[in-house]
Amino acid sequence: MCQVVLPFLSVSLRDFYHSASTTMIQQENLKKRLARLAAPIFIETLLIMMLGAVDTVMLSRHSDNSVAAVGVVNQIIMLTFLVFEVINLGTSVLCSQYLGARLHKQVVQVVGVSLLVNFAVGVGISMLLFGCAEPILRLMGLGPELMQDGMDYMRIVGAFAFFQALSLTLSASLRSANKAVYPMLVTVVVNVLNIIGNYSLIFGRFGFPELGVEGAAISTAF
């Protein structure tokens, strides 16, 4: 009896440990893949949020009124980004499904439609932010002493919101293709250029005129 049972138990235990070891390795590989995907997305999102924060910090050396006005406008700008991200969420889901099924033609179609939709929505938002800057800021409770700075910043940054819409769509498409590192690197470069542009245009360095709030807006928009 023992001669029959012991080999059976030995084989069963060996299979169990082999299966458990394989499962643990698969889980570790999955964790590493998730980390490689999530880390660039987290960094990219953080850097996008830093664009407005950098403007606020650098403007604090120029004017207190500018800081207060830009802080209010940045809240509105971040809300518009949420609108774009709703469309991009659907883009990511569809692209991931089609890429998994190797339907590359459909992926191109989804990205194209998303770019068109976000471009149309972005143009509408740009027109709204540019044309209705004053009533929107009054609705947000911005005081008269801050109104001009707020309007200048909002009109310049808002007028080019559709560029950000297209950029976010392309980023979502690349993330769904497991290429999240490329949008992150682009965002790093954008932040560096924004800091240099702010320093040049806010304070009038390197031969540029001193533009204050308008300089920060131009640097952020472009």
Regions flagged by a language model, labelled:
Residues M1-I41, C95-F162, L193-I196, F208-F222:
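Short alpha-helical transmembrane segments in multi-pass integral membrane proteins
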Residues K31-M50, V54, I76-V83, A159, ...:
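Residue-level signal for short hydrophobic patches within transmembrane helices
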Residues I41, T45, T56-V57, V93, ...:
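Transmembrane alpha-helix boundary and packing residues in multipass membrane permease domains
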Residues T45-A53, S126, F130, N191:
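Recurrent gating helices in multi-pass secondary carriers
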Residues M50-A53, R61-D64, Y98-A101, S176-A177, ...:
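Helix-loop interface residues and adjacent transmembrane-helix termini in multi-pass membrane transporters
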Residues T56, V67-M127, Q164-S176, A180-P183:
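Small-residue-rich hydrophobic transmembrane alpha-helices
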Residues L59-M78, P144-D149, V213-I218:
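Interfacial/gating helices of multi-pass transporter permease domains
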Residues N118, S173-S200, A217:
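Alpha-helical transmembrane segments of multi-pass membrane transporters/permeases
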